[in-house]
């Protein structure tokens, strides 16, 4: 499986996923559908208090795995230390202990996101800290009893299926023929940076997430799928 690195947020290297399991044909309609799906998930995460639960719903809706259950697979034993900006966002001093996780958020075989997470252990229960240290449960599920809410600091579209200037293309220009090739989808589709707050509006974590192309790892929607 081929992988490569990019940099996100505070300069951390992020491991990106290999090719998706279900490539789409490269047609104008398929590109529009891909953009619509990317922006749908992007908007759902922005509007949701939990990226974890949103990804699980997405996995279930598009039958990516059975059961549609998200796991957080650790990919680095010693994630980077939190910088001054993270501590400022979390409203903690330089002396306050922070812990971090760098994980792959997977649903079945599909890598849906890479997440870097810095959290304040003193603001979680001992049981929550133990689960974060010893299990593959996603952060959002572990802290669910705190009724967490997200405040987005940044949301970035990393790839658009529509080429720049597509709206200025000459009318009547020939479109790519159906079945002319496979849609080439890069590993990273969009990224979020957010603060997670408890119900008391106390910051408990900062997360940097890069959402991966396996969010589209299902057959083309009916509008663009080949007809029998």
Predicted segments with their positions:
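Positively charged n-region of N-terminal signal peptides that target proteins for export
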Residues: 1-4
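Bacterial N-terminal signal peptides
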Residues: 7-15
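N-terminal domain-onset segments
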Residues: 20-106, 110-190, 197-206, 210, ...
């Amino acid at each position: 499986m081929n992988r490569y690195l990019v940099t996100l947020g505070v300069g951390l290297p992020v491991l990106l996923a290999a090719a998706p399991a279900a490539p789409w044909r490269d047609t104008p309609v398929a590109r529009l559908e891909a953009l619509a799906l990317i922006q749908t998930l992007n908007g759902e995460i922005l509007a949701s208090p939990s990226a974890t639960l949103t990804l699980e719903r997405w996995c279930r809706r598009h039958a990516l795995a059975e059961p549609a259950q998200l796991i957080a697979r650790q990919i680095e034993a010693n994630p980077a230390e939190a910088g001054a900006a993270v501590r400022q966002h979390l409203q903690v001093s330089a002396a306050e202990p922070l812990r971090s996780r760098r994980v792959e958020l997977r649903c079945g075989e599909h890598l849906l996101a890479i997440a870097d997470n810095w959290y304040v252990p003193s603001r979680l229960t001992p049981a929550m800290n133990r689960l974060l240290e010893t299990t593959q449960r996603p952060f959002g599920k572990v802290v669910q009893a705190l009724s967490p809410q997200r405040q987005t600091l940044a949301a970035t579209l990393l790839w658009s299926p529509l080429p720049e200037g597509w709206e200025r293309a000459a009318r009547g220009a020939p479109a790519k023929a159906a079945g002319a090739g496979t849609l080439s989808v890069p590993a990273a589709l969009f990224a979020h940076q957010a603060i997670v707050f408890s119900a008391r509006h106390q910051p408990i974590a900062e997360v940097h997430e890069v959402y991966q192309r396996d969010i589209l790892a299902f057959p083309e929607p009916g509008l663009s799928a080949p007809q029998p």
